[in-house]
């Protein structure tokens, strides 16, 4: 039986296709993979350059057809993966570059469930990789402890500094700022992320966050010498030694919370520049945040403490805040704490660094195998550029990026450098590198089906542009996951020593309840161990959640996702005194939301 492809015999074409100068809707209905890939490749260019093509796709069913291709799922076949990626790029181009009516049609075409599934899959892969890395690190550590020969200077019996709980006697002195709100010890969402509130997670030994700038930090007297004779990092093969990332949901008490101090480029010292430390190429420095000043001591005693990278405080994609520093009421009932610089949740972090080992000692025992340290593309490259379009050898979408205005028109991340016309390649995800080193079939199955970093980044960017319309908010707060896109089976195959679980057949998507709120998923990407581009666009999406609905009289919704209560009249709810953007109906909602809100709560200038 003949396929339902259209052909044009008079021009010797086996099927209708889309070119860079001709758009034909029939080409999207092609059932053969190769001509469909060719058409999608040219359509990606057309959706980038032509507003008319974007408008036509909203009325001829083209967007719905592209979303159907995405909902068919990602296959391990290379051609199928290529087809899926091109269709995804086309939808993102339509939503990012289109007008309000075009963006509305993208949301109405049921694109939000696809994005929600991509973000959820990525979070699951991150959690699975971190859990396996921690278990392998523990097994490797116990193997080294069993082979170690005890000496008079051997202190290997002590727990690792990544595992040692913080006690009141071990914490260093710091400045005290009385918080206006006391954070409960148990955060929400703990059914997915269980963490010990007394254990501090750090990203890597070379990225220990500081509670204050280096010139004001108070260190213990033996901070650089307590591990000088520690032999744990001097022997053994550390191929599987993984440094755990900061958890996506860090447990915290009333004393936790990281202070941010943005540093401009013109304030850097020569020793702070990324190119100064040429020997540490495996752990690049952030171009926006320098290292702590190097004190005149020997290289064997160099401190590993660095200042935590600061989040860029940018406005949302739609422009300025709705009402700026409005005169909305505040939740701080203490008249003594009404200063403008005092946040309503005045929290600080303090961290024990007494048992942090020397940098050279730690790096000397780490092999060349991949770890789970996140390397941000904006940190890896000298110029902070990122291009979301996947250019191929046959793609004509080579847009001139010499002009700074073109970068803004492309809808790219504001972290781009205007003087660089070439976009560097994305650094591979540390999680994909981790699974790539595993030779099991299950690991490679996860590698082929897991979302790529650029997929997650484009998803967040598309959400940033469509989530600012309050009339579409119900699509984001009442969504679902696409069954054919989920990777639960692949993740379950990674479990060692467990019997395979018989998963039920995928239920039809139209039968699934719309019980998924996409904003909590997006909020997880504001945590610091994700790349800065992911953090930026996730912060934009969360700030769009705080917009007032002009169609309902300019009222706002409680920013805590489990509440969702709307104001009955304008300025009924109180604003967060720090960012002056989020509103909460009660202090209880603010306490519960602060666990994640602290990552995207930026002080209003």
UniProtKB/Swiss-Prot annotation:
A zinc finger (MYND-type) spans 560-601. Residues 134-187, 203-352 are annotated as: Disordered. Residues 320-336 have a biased composition (Acidic residues). One of its GO terms (molecular function) is zinc ion binding. Keywords: Cytoplasm, Metal-binding, Sporulation, Zinc, Zinc-finger. Its main location: cytoplasm. The keyword Protein biosynthesis does not apply. GO terms for cellular component: cytoplasm; MUB1-RAD6-UBR2 ubiquitin ligase complex. PROSITE patterns: ZF_MYND_1, ZF_MYND_2. GO terms for biological process: establishment or maintenance of cell polarity; positive regulation of flocculation; sporulation resulting in formation of a cellular spore; ubiquitin-dependent protein catabolic process. Pfam families: zf-MYND (PF01753). Residues 279-315 have a biased composition (Polar residues). It is found in: Cytoplasm. Zn(2+) binds at residues 576, 579, 597, 601. Involved in determination of the onset of polarized growth and morphogenesis. Plays a role in the regulation of branching in hyphae and spore formation. Belongs to the MUB1/samB family. This is MYND-type zinc finger protein samB. It comes from Aspergillus fumigatus (strain CBS 144.89 / FGSC A1163 / CEA10) (Neosartorya fumigata).
